[in-house]
Amino acid sequence: MKIDYSKLEKKIDYKFKNRNLLVQSLTHKSFNKMNNNEKIEFLGDRVLGLVIAKKLLEIYPEEKEGILDKKYASLVNKKTCLEIAKSINLQNYILIFNPK
């Protein structure tokens, strides 16, 4: 099955310079033991955290750290990320072993 990643790029309004990184980031370890998303996921989690923290500081420059921390936690948790993933049908682009 061939996946059209350009549709995903349109949904997120970003064109990847290196499409291989996109494919690797969507490849589960069960599909490819060597070239999968584990290290990219590790890095991506940190990048997401930094971007969210920076944006919160820009939007709420006078807010107390405790409030910012709660807002941050609500934005980077699994539930929020899952909702965003579903909204762009990310499951249609993930490579995972399926023994049907």
Regions found by a protein language model. Give the residues of each.
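RNase III-family endoribonuclease catalytic core
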Residues: 1-100
